[in-house]
Amino acid sequence: MTEFQGYLELDRSWQHDLLYPLIFREYIYTFVHDHGLNRNKSNLLENVGYDNKSSLLIVKRLISRMYQQNHLIISANDSNQNPVFGYNKFFFSQMISEGFAVVVEIPFSLRLVSSLKGTELVKYYNLQSIHSTFPFFEDKFPHLNYVSDVLIPYPIHLEILVQTLRYWVKDVSSLHLLRLFLHEYYSWNRFRIPKKSISFFSKSNPRFFLFLYNSYVCEYESILLFLRNQSSHLRLTSSEGFFERIYFYGKMKHPVKEVFADDFPTNLWFFQDLVIHYVRYQGKSILASKDMPLLMNKWKFYLVHLWQCHFYVWSQAGSISINQLSKHAFGFLGYLSSMRINLSVVRSQMLENSFLMDNAMKKIDTLISISPLIGSLAKMKFCNVVGQPLSKSTWADLSDFDIIDRFARICRNLFHYYSGASKKKSLYRVKYILRLSCVKTLARKHKSTVRTFLKRLGSELLDEFFTEEEEVLSLIFPRTYSTLRRLYKGRIWYLDIFCINDLVNYE
């Protein structure tokens, strides 16, 4: 992002004029294509040259035509090529929206960095790894009692997205252009695929979609943080929350004020939240607390009223369940986490007297849910739905080295990601599926049977599937039963993981 800011010479004063780089800095569209900002690389973007799709004259003409009335009318002829430009209108609006997302992301990122500098999170870059939340669970969750898994509602109304952005983007013309993009996408998708408009929107224009989603989540979490910070000041003087971003908070002079009178039969006292933890991941969030369910119920109604009153998204309090960690397990990023109580007896002796003490220690168990893993492997044609390995026919044309390397990389990354699991028995089943699928793919390529190919190849293929920790331990210790048992039970956290893409990238 710093590189783009240097090229565009964009600082915070450009919040009042965001259309200037979009119209007069045409190399933005080259950045979108050449720097891999558009991860969903369509055939159009790969086959069309820069001179044909990103000239300044075409961009200016297209923006002018977008404001004409006949351009917004969706008809059956829109799928054909435009006689003026040579491509359909949706392609050009997608191109400009990608450039628009790049320009607007810069002040958005500056706002995020400036907000983080004002907090105690000095090394905020450590939060980039989503896998770093698991050590947090190990340290904090044994001391917590209740957890709630919340699905962040989305999508919201298009106009609410524009109103959310207008509080920090002061360029009115950019907001009008954003509104035009949103309504055009909505009209286009409603005409072509009415049931999967959001899915189509996110796949056809991922950068633009992620920018809108991140702005929505940033606004939602800023209000949530505001409520959390102000909750400690509301004990003596009751206050009323106004869900307006400009005039958000108002003090009440009288000591007690009924808040949400239609939903609560008695006066509601705000009180300080001693322990409340919030974690967000992949469109979901987790709320955890040590206190009684009263605190969790209060924040559950906070969230419901926030979504309904501010973002106009329908949500029900009954859809947010509050579970006790000692009795219920919850799924998180492919793990199945639960609370385990380790009982032990400690003998204590003081002078001539001795007595026994029962000691109970809480520990988080992170297990691997094998069913989603088998489902992902079956979807990518590595096995069938019951886990029987299959040959990967689409990779049969590759070289032997590439085939083995791809299978081994997927296996190592899965072990890398699930290294923090308490038990790794399910991972060894996945390794068996990938290893046998690799052998079947090679045998299919060489038109041989699996048995014959294994005899000719020997045990060299097995070495490619050793994981990183297995290689290190094999150099230090002999491969005995005790070593494998420690490896099976050991928990090694790798904090450099962003995502697992190998099952998808090669398709």
Curated annotation (Swiss-Prot):
Signal peptide stretch: none
UniProt keyword list: Chloroplast, mRNA processing, Plastid, RNA-binding, tRNA processing
Family annotation (Pfam families): Intron_maturas2, MatK_N
One of the protein's GO biological processes: tRNA processing
GO MF assignments: RNA binding
Subcellular location: Plastid, Chloroplast
GO cellular component terms, semicolon-separated: chloroplast
Cross-referenced InterPro entries: Domain_X (IPR024937), Maturase_MatK (IPR002866), Maturase_MatK_N (IPR024942)
Record-annotated disulphide pairs: none
Similarity comment text for this entry: Belongs to the intron maturase 2 family. MatK subfamily.
Entry function: Usually encoded in the trnK tRNA gene intron. Probably assists in splicing its own and other chloroplast group II introns.
Official protein name in the record: Maturase K
Top-level taxonomy: Eukaryota, Viridiplantae, Streptophyta, Embryophyta, Tracheophyta
